[in-house]
Each structure stands twice: as C-alpha cells, then as structure tokens.
Regions:
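Histidine/acidic residue-rich metal-binding segments in metalloenzymes
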Residues: 1-120, 133-145
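Mid-to-C-terminal alpha-helical segments outside catalytic/metal-binding sites
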Residues: 69-70, 78, 88-89, 107, ...
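Aromatic- and acid-rich polysaccharide-binding/catalytic face
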Residues: 120, 124-126
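Active-site glycine-centered loops adjacent to acidic/histidine catalytic or metal-binding residues
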Residues: 152
Length: 258
C-alpha cells in the first residue's frame, strides 16, 4: 500500500507508466508483506507470537486492494507476486470476493471487465509459501500454476539450511504429484520471472546435493543454528516476549542482540 509511505494509491493514474513498463517487459511486481500496511499489534502486552502468527495473512488486505484495481483490465499479462504471504487464506478470500460481487456489486459498481474475481486473481496473482500444507491441500481452489515455493532466507521465518527436507515433507504429506512438485518448486517461478537457472547452470549443478557441495567448498557453514551462531540477549530471559518489547527492540531501545 504506497499510501502508507505518502505516495498515491495503486488506483491513481500516477502508476500507469509503471504498469505499462512492467507489462511490456514481463516484470513481476512483488508485493511483500509488511512493506505497506503492516498488521497492528493488539497491545504492548500481547505476546509477540500473536503478531507473528497473523503476519502473513495481513497481505490479504493488499491483495484485495490490488484485485479491485481497474489497471489489471488494461494489461492481461501483468503479474503480482504476494511474496511471503502464504496460500491457505486464498480460497476463502476468493469465495468472499465472489460473494461481494454478487451481493454488493449492484451498488458498489465493481468492474472486473466481465470476469469473475477468481478468474482475474488466477490471471494476475502469484502466491508464495514457506510452510503451508493447508494451502497446498486446497491448491485446486487457488490454481497450482499460481503457487510458488520460497524459503525467506535469511530471515527468522526461513527453514534454511534444512529447506529441502522441510519442503519435501510438506509436499509428501499433501500428496502432490511429481508434475505438481516441479511446478511449485521451480517451473512456476521460471515461467513467471523469466529466469531459468537450470538452463544457465545445468540441472546437475542445481540439485540439493550439488549446491550443498558448492557451499561446503566455499566454506559456508550450513549447520542449524539459533541467532546465526551469535548470543542473542533477547533470548536470555524468562517469561513471554511481548509486542511492546519487540517494538522497542526495532526502535533501537531496550533489549539488543550481540
């Protein structure tokens, strides 16, 4: 949501040239969680876990804002990636959008160019997951071609360095076919971002084993660690971490990490 940073909304003609250039050059627009409207902290006393748990789903507000943008009707190939937002919330979001069009459309005058909200979403939006079995189980409601895997490296939500094992566990639990696994792990990304590392490097150099060997030879430590191997003072405490404490941390006050 650019208005959070003092810019015009995505519905303003201010951005028309950007949409045009992105569409002409097949550039995906990445809408990352937290870059615009962040989910509010319920209170300073609320355990920070509550905020972390709800954070990915906060992107639904941005998804709704963009889905109702008439600029999507001008550019059939414009793609928006809902980065780090997960997938599980999407089926109900689309169901609600369908209900809204049928129930409120006569007075809201929403314009989907004769299409349904779900149809427009599948044409223009990409969803990204780190760990989201519920979303994968409902892939038919989202569109398998709209789901991409990510690992969030190097942030705290990342499953690195055990990302391959963690990801395969999810895909295996859900029962994705080999074709579907290839789609969500790399083919969808290659297609939409127009970047094919397999073609550039060779498939034999893009396997988990090959990449881990490259890391080993480069002296990269891929052992599982907490805090990157450093001693984090904020973990040397008893009691629950609250929203207020974390807000102070990011403001440069209170607890710090070495």
């Amino acid at each position: 949501n650019p208005t959070c940073h003092g810019f015009p909304s995505v519905h303003n003609a201010h951005w028309d040239k950007l949409w045009e250039v992105c569409a002409e050059n097949d550039v995906v627009i990445n809408c990352h969680i937290g870059t615009g409207a962040q989910p509010p902290h319920s209170s300073p006393d609320t355990p920070i876990d509550a905020w972390i748990a709800a954070f990915p789903m906060s992107i639904a507000n941005s998804a709704a804002d963009w889905l109702y943008g008439e600029f999507l009707l001008k550019y059939d190939n414009l793609k928006i990636s809902l980065t780090e937002g997960g997938v599980g919330w999407v089926p109900y979001f689309l169901e609600r959008a369908e209900f809204t069009l049928d129930h409120h459309g006569p007075w809201t005058k929403s314009n989907f160019g004769g299409k349904r909200p779900t149809e427009l979403f599948r044409e223009h939006f990409l969803t990204c997951f780190i760990e989201d079995e519920s979303g994968l189980r409902n892939r038919d409601l989202v569109g398998i071609e709209n789901i991409l895997f990510e690992c969030d490296y190097p942030h705290s939500d990342s499953t690195w360095p055990m990302t391959p094992e963690n990801t395969f566990r999810q895909l295996d639990n859900v029962g994705l076919s080999d074709e579907e696994i290839n789609q969500v792990t790399h083919l969808n990304a290659i297609k939409n971002f127009n970047f094919d590392p397999i073609a550039i490097l060779g498939r034999e150099n893009c396997t988990v084993g090959a990449l881990r060997e490259q890391a080993r030879q480069a002296g990269i430590d891929t052992r599982e660690k907490s805090g990157g191997g450093n001693s984090a003072k904020i973990t040397d405490r008893s009691g629950r971490m609250t929203s207020g404490e974390v807000q102070k941390l990011f403001a440069g006050e209170g607890a710090t990490a070495d």
